[in-house]
Amino acid sequence: LCRNVNFDLKRAEGYRNFCTNLLIATRFVLMNVEGKDCGVGATANEPMQFSFVDKWIISEFERTVKEVTTAYEDYRLDNAANAIYSFVWNQYCDWYVELSKVQLRGSEAEQRATRHTLVTVLEAVLRLAHPIIPFITEELWQKVSVTAGVRKSDEDAFLMLQTYPTFDAMKVDADAVARMTTIQAQIDSIRNLRSEMKLPPSQKMPLLISGPEAECAAAAPYLQQLARLESVTHVEDLQQAAQGSVAPVAIVGDSKLMLKVEIDVKAERERLSKEAARLAGEVKKCQSKLGNERFVSKAPAAVVDTEKKRLAEFTALLAKVEEQLDKLPAE
């Protein structure tokens, strides 16, 4: 089927930024793997301790390969490009590269596995993206392929002649994906707690976490790295440990998380009271509009729906602020 796609300068800028991000990621990988044991070639049989994070990024890559293959079979080049874009930017660069910084401080077997995963997944990504962005992938592949053990340093080879990635279901680890999904949700929740408490992202804070101890211990270094935490402390009973604190608590699966923050009760009461008054005003405005029969009957359905959503959002926020006010100790 013929599809007309309008040229969009903003989208072109976005893909330029994507290529820049791919270049930065490649520099990071090479800086950490060149001249070091990556578990390829002569050291391929040396022990490597792959973490659930390594297994997760490999699983995500395989999922992307499957998605890209389906897109090509359906003659949807746009879907193929979007799948590659999403994996490289959202999974590899935003998550795995950052998480790998934790593992590169681990044991030699952990470091070797992380270096191996960093470079082999990147090399495979360059092969996957080559038909869509041939020039930059060829340039980067020439630098990455030797370290990845794909070619020898004195061997002339071109990316366009390499085997294209194919989906391998055996490399998909559902358990690793599930564990990583929990870690991502925990990190997102901690960031939301920061935002809710108006804490700057640069300010490192201690975290209290309750839940299965082994899982919390495994997650702790990753939470500390990506959520910019001063420390992560496991407690059996968060409610008891946080007694007297007014900090909000996030619940993710079996775990509860709370930033340990010393709060000026008087200032916090004043701030929350102002916010509650503002939200109450917004709720009243929405209720007034929706209670007006002329507005409901004459306004477009989309406008009425938007107003209903605003009312629901403001009502939920007001309830949350009032809950925080109730938690404040008496002065």
Locate the predicted segments by residue.
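Feature 926 captures the class I aminoacyl-tRNA synthetase adenylation module centered on the KMSKS loop
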Residues: 3-331
